[in-house]
Structures are given as C-alpha cells and as structure tokens.
Swiss-Prot record:
Stored CDD domains: Ribosomal_L1
PTM-bearing positions, type Phosphoserine: 354, 384, 388, 461
UniProt keyword terms in alphabetical order: Acetylation, Coiled coil, Isopeptide bond, Nucleus, Phosphoprotein, Ubl conjugation
Subcellular location: Nucleus, Nucleolus
Protein name as annotated: Ribosomal L1 domain-containing protein 1
N-acetylmethionine modified-residue sites: 1
Amino acid sequence: MEASASNPPSTSPETSASTPETPPGPEQLDEEQVKKAVEALLAHSRSRKNANGLLLNENENFFLMVVLWKIPSKELRVRLSLPHGIRSDLADVCLFTKDEPNLSSEQTERYYKKLLNNHGIKTISQIIPFRTLKKEYKAYEAKLRLLGSFDFFITDARIRRLLPSHLGRHFYNRKKVPVSVNLQSKTLSREINDCIGGTVLNISKSGSCSTIRIGHTGMPIQHIVENVVAVAKSLSQKLPEKWESVKLLFVKTERSVSLPVFSSFVSSQGEAKGLRTRDLLKKVSKKSRKKTERALKRQQEKKEKKLLKQAAKAKPAPTTDAVAPKTGGVPTQDPAPQEETGGVSALPKAQDDSEDEIPLLVPLKETPAAGSTKIQKAAIGKKSPKKSPGPNTARAKKRKASPALETPIAAEPKTPGKGPGKKARVKEEVEKERNSSLGKKDPRQTPKKPEAKFFTTASSSVKKAPRTLTQRPKKPKVPQST
C-alpha cells in the first residue's frame, strides 16, 4: 500500500513536464482503442440481426460523436474528406442544377448528363433543374417524396442560396441539406467524388455535441478506423480553436450505446491549450496580488476620508477656546452687529425726545412698505363715506385729517436729539433702506392698486363741488270755493 501511495506523486512531475513538449493534437488519439470500440459495435449489430432475423444486406451507419468545450456562437457546416467512401454504389444521389439560358428544363437536364459523362461520373442517379423543382415539387407531399427517395443531395454552387425557400424545413431537420459543388471546375470528377465519399459536420448553436457519419457496418474494420483518424486530423485544422476545442470523442451506431475513444482529461479549456501548470499558478498569483493591492488601497482611502471628516468636525471647537483666553473671559461681539444695534437704539432716543405724542418713526429693519400699509389702512377707512348715511360735508372733514397723519413722517428729522451728527446718521440710514427696498418687494406688502384708486377718487372728489340741497318753495294751497 505504501508503494502504491508513493507512485502517483513520482509520476506527476513527469506528466507536468511532458505536457508542454507534446502539444495537444490528433496524435493523442489511440488507434487501438478505436479498433476495439469498432469491433465491439460490429459484434453488437450482428447479434441484433440474428436475434431479430433481419436481412443480411441491411447495414447500419457508423457515427463519430464530437463533444466540444464551448457551444459555438454561430452554426458551422464543415465538409470533411474521407479516404474510404461511406456510401455504396447503390446509394441514390440527386443533383440540382441551374437553368441554362434559352433552354428548357429537359434540354438543361440532357446538357448536364453529357457534362457528367464526359468527366466519367456515374454515381449521380437523377438531375433536377431549378425550374422543375419550383413547378413539380411545390406541394408539401411532393417535397416529402423527394426527401425520402434519395440518400444524398448535391447542388450547383450558383443556386445554393435559393434552395432553402423551395425545399422546406424537413431537409434541414433530417440533416439532408444539399452540398454545394462547382460544376464549372476542370476537376469536376474529383470534387463530386470527394463530396459523395466524404462527410459533413453540422455544429449547431443549441449544444456542444454533434455527430459525423464515418462509415457503415458493411465496411471492413480497418477502413472505419482510418476514417476516424482522418476526421480527427481534419477537425484539428477546420475547427475555430483547432484541436483544443475538442473535449470528448465517441463511436456509435444508429441503435447502440456510444463508446468513448478520446478524452482530453483536463478541467478547463486553458489547460487544453498546452499551458504549463506553473504558468497558470503564476497567473493566479498575479491576479490575487492585484486584488489584495486594490483592497489595501481602498482601505487606506477610507481611513483617510474618516480622518479628514474627524478633523473637519474638531476644527470649530479649538477656535472658540483659543479666542476665550485672549478676551480675558469677557464676551465680545463683532463690529457689524454693534453698528446695527447702535442705529436701532438711536431711533427710540429720538422718539423719546420728540414733542409729538404719535410715534410714527419706523425702525431700520422695517421697510417703507410697512408704512405704506398703514397709510393704505387709513385710506381704506376713508373710503367708507359711501356707507355712512351722513351728508357730504363729513367727507371733507375726513379728507382734511389725512395730511395730519402723513405730516409726522415729514417732521421726523425736526425732533430734537442729543447731537446733530446722530440726526444725519439716522437720515442716511433711513434713505439707504428706502432706496434698497424700492427694488425688492415685501411679501407682506399689500398691492398698490387700491392706493391708486383712493387717490384717483380723492382727486375726482376734490374737483367736484359739493352739492347743497335746494328746496323749491311750495305753492300755497288755495281753498276750493264751494
């Protein structure tokens, strides 16, 4: 047990060292393993024939199953040539040809028969021009009969793109798509023989597994093995990623189990490309290092951001503490608020010294809009003479009272103060505030429309003279004479 346990590690370095020297290719396919699988499948098919009493002439097809590492993004159709033909002489082959100009369908058929006889081709059983295909095989049942009556279809390369719309989906579902051939080539016999004797690999987007026809049970074993090896070599040349894209190979018949022939024995496609294990480890280590470096950088950036935030929060606290000892514990204020308070305090002093009893001075913070609201309120009060039942003389009295209300604003600077400098300051501040408030509107200010209406009504009422009631003398009643 100890010896068996010690053997695998000793062999592992040899295998790892041998992988780069022997790149992956069709040479890795073991012909002896393929031969054993083919013999087992032939024995199985013979036993089935004897058990079911089938005809001896009936042959089953051999298939090579190919499993790829990745599902291709596009459908592929690869033509592969084989050293030994997989179709017997009894196979029925159909050829679709182009319509020749100024010739009928029968004449075109005769023309291509002569062409094939001149090149010594006798494997094609029927020729169908494109015009007859459109007319005679338009119905669904006719297409099915055409599909079942032939084993293989060939078409002229000039009309290949026109066939799918006329053949239908059943040709493509049953993998009997016509193979294109150049009928104008000088080596026409070689092309047609390769096409009939060869095979086609259809790789679909729906899965990674596809099958290739490589022979039948009536062929000798060695011919089937040679066909398998030839297909493996052509796969290594025509697949998108060469031999690296091949994962598994199986051999099977139509009604048998698939037997494995080749396996790449790798866990990923990167290892199939012949990369060394050391190189893979280096790549993994580089990636891990980069990830760790990025994580460390992110952590450092987060720490720096936290420190900056803490410093920004702690900045205002030391500034207040530093200012307090300089003042000696006495709180100080900024010069700007002192000027404002001084300006505001000057107004009440002027109000106290004023001789008028009605204080109409407006503070600095208050805009002249507030004063206008007061005047408008007084004006609204004056507008009530329509409602008052008194005579028109009462209106004149109320009109006389309005200038008395507005006079104190004009007489504001006349109030005695403590000094002439203070009066001048008060005037300048009031004028500045008024000028600044002209451009800005106070949301509390009432609209100016009623004010204009009041003055218009007042002017109109001033122009009109007061009307006095004149009583006409009543006629004395004359007593009626009786």
